[in-house]
Amino acid sequence: MTLTRRSLMRGTAAALAVPALGSLGAMPAAAQDKTWKHGLSLFGALKYPEGFKNFDYVNPAAPQGGTVRQVAFGTFDNFNTVVAGVKGSIAIGTELYNETLMTSALDEVSTEYGLLAEAVSHPDDFSTVTYRLRANARWHDGKPVTPEDVIFSFNAFKENSPQLGAYYRHVTKAEKTGDRDITFTFDGPGNRELPQIVGQLPVLPKHWWEGTDKNGKKRDVTQTTLEPPLGSGPYRLKDFAPGRSLVYEKVDNYWGKDLNVVVGTRNFQQIRYEYFRDSTVALEAFKGDQVDWRTENSAKNWATAYDFPAVRDKKVVLEEFDIRNIGVMQSFAFNIRRDKFKDPRVRRAFNFAFDFEEMNKQIFFGQYKRINSFFEGTELASAGLPEGRELEILNTVKDQVPPEVFTTPYSNPKGGDQQALRNNLRDALKLFRDAGYDIKDTKLVNAKTGEQFAVEFLVDDPASERFVLFYKPSLERLGIVVNSRTVDAAQYENRLRQWDYDIIVASWGQSLSPGNEQRDFWSSAAADQPGSRNMIGIKNPAIDKLIERVIFTKDRDDLVAATKALDRVLLWNFYVVPQWTYGKVRSARWDRFSRPETMPKYGLAAFPTIWWFDADKAAKVPQRS
């Protein structure tokens, strides 16, 4: 479920205060027989009952105030989330003012509790869902959040956002069915996840978007904008420098501040983001006390760059947080829209040429392990040979998948020394020859055309280029021409939108309950959809069938089996060269902040969502800038 996963990656906390049904107000006649609930669970019961006070992992008495300064990478020229990923570069932090109907708890899997919505109802067959808005939900201009706002937002995203449009394509209509009620109708029954997906809809103010700006120009929800948008959330945009920095400030009269979804969260008075184009510069900014928090993605930096005076004096705290909320595939991903990558033997040959074990020793200080699944680190990852329900599912596509799916456990080639690399390159060359290539004058050429095999790795940061440069000599030993092209964030986004690349570094985060987002990742329908996450260009009937099997599962065991089957077929088609994972979030912070004693199991660091500014600590660690 991608939208929920995105909120988890942001560390967004969620909670709900729902009154007893007697206080919901008069129901419309059509809704009299509805069973209203305070939350949704994909499988099983909700942890938190109706009327709960706050989430277990927050401090309801957390001090309020203070400023936190964070890092963002790249640039931004847009605040309109409707066209994010299609036009311009969206600013970080839009979730601070854009609220959703429902929101997720960070200590549960695939549950939602109402935020803008106070209650939700759906029939047993999941063919529709109805949300009831809270009577006190307000925009920052004081106007109420209405069903018309929800319907406007749904239509805007469905018509203009390729990614969300793909999620909502099975929602046939949204209509007002009561003073505060909105009903969404689906194109068929049985899709248990659709009510939750609709609940993750960011709600926009219809009256603001259909109005005019300070210059009298009519606003356009289909275009980028740098006009600070009207929101309903706990923060508003106070100040910004395009492409450089953002300052969000807490809304004093925020309508939802006493909701138990909000209690203990969003405790800072200001949240600042400083943009950097280079991770090395960002690290130096952190060392210089220009930002408060840093997530470290470099193994080398983690091993060598944090022995500076503030760390030794315990003014900077280094801490790792377990990753339990997502599975991940990080990879060198092929664009199989290009003819040279259509043959899976070619793609597999690239994996034989990648010596992860040697790279791990030389570059990563031995910190990483190889990824062997598209759902790495979860119970959803396939292993061994298929059996039981997974085997039954795979048998439904047996004639459409590689035979190894049933006979051979997937594993990546092992390197780590020169003999192992020579053996792997020998296997790679055999695969190339089987695919119609040959060696001529030390060059790998197409046996029919004589054209040398050439490949370009497209990256957007120096760290990724470093990985490519390590990989490059092995490919060149096979007679391949290898180029690495590093471009800025805007160029990178534009080339991705146009599918203009050979190989990119790509990753897919996976929730613990996969569902409709798998269509956006791997389906034939998404392969030619601009803005989709099917960056590989997969058009595979077996995978399409398995995706639908994942979406329409009826219980957790069936979901796990169907996901393992999908994982196995993806792996044996060699769409990517899997990279590596650490399994933890590495973080560094200036010691001015505190957090609850009990951290949410699936919330990563949950910073800054459930943390707060600690004045006593800050007095001992005064800011240098």
Positions of PLM-derived features:
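Ligand-site clamp/hinge motif
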Residues: R134, Q223, Y254-Y306, R348, ...
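Aromatic- and charge-enriched surface segment that lines or borders ligand/interaction sites
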Residues: V58, A62, G85-I92, A119-Q163, ...
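Surface-exposed binding/hinge segments that line
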Residues: R132, A166-K214, S232-A241, P386-K398
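Detector for C-terminal structural segments
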Residues: L8, A13-L21, A72-G74, L96, ...
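Aromatic-rich, solvent-exposed beta-strand/loop patch
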Residues: G114-S121, D125, H140, V145, ...
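Extracellular/periplasmic solute-recognition and catalytic clefts
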Residues: K173-K176, K238-E249, E274-R338, R348-A349, ...
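Gly/Pro-rich hinge or "lid" segments in bacterial periplasmic/extracellular proteins
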Residues: I92-S110, N155, G199-T265, Q269-Q270, ...
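N-terminal lobe/hinge region of extracytoplasmic solute-binding protein
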Residues: D33-D125, N155, L230
